[in-house]
Regions:
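Nucleotide-sugar donor-binding catalytic core of glycosyltransferases
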Residues: 1-105, 119, 123-167
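A short acidic, often aromatic-flanked loop/helix-cap motif at beta-alpha or helix-coil junctions
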Residues: 109-114
């Protein structure tokens, strides 16, 4: 993934990449294959590709369908984000921490259309920061919070000592 991410393009177009095992969640996934089978803006692959081909296909798409499998989380969700692409998945409370990430959440997969993808691109393309997915972002955030906590402690200790010294 690291090698492919270095050459990943971060431009968004209304194209969708689909690649997953139907058998992992047959009830939902079979319907999805049928839903997008004849859409010219959706590319469907079966999961027998090499890892390199699979990752390159993600790299060449803008949106990656990441339906629930054995659980609500999917490696596809995180691979898409890591490669600078937008995963599409259904709302679930476990994703509340992902609200600031470039993710297209739907209530039902039947909502997905080329128009929805175009609207997402137009309305949200500049409202997300891809930087939040980098190690440097989290390093800086933790370092800042650590420094802020030290400052807060020193201020509280000084105020406490000033209060105690009054008596």
């Amino acid at each position: 993934i690291t090698e492919v991410s270095k050459i990943s393009k971060n431009t968004l177009e209304s194209n969708l990449y689909i690649n997953f095992k139907i058998s992992t969640n047959y009830k939902e996934r079979e319907i999805l294959y049928k839903q997008f089978l004849n859409e010219d803006w959706a590319k469907i692959d079966f999961p027998n590709l090499s890892v390199t081909d699979y990752l390159n296909n993600i790299k060449n798409a803008s949106f990656i369908l990441a339906p629930w499998g054995n659980g609500v989380d999917s490696h596809r969700f995180w691979e898409a984000l890591y490669l600078g692409k937008v995963p599409i998945t259904k709302h679930h409370h476990t994703y509340k921490t992902a609200k600031h990430l470039p993710v297209l959440f739907v209530n039902d997969y039947s909502e997905i259309s080329k128009e929805i993808l175009n609207n997402f691109i137009e309305n949200f393309k500049d409202s997300y920061s891809w930087e939040v997915l980098s190690i440097q972002y989290w390093h800086d955030l933790i370092k800042k919070d650590y420094k802020d906590s030290e400052t807060t402690y020193v201020i509280k200790e000084s105020l406490f000592n000033a209060y105690v010294n009054k008596f």
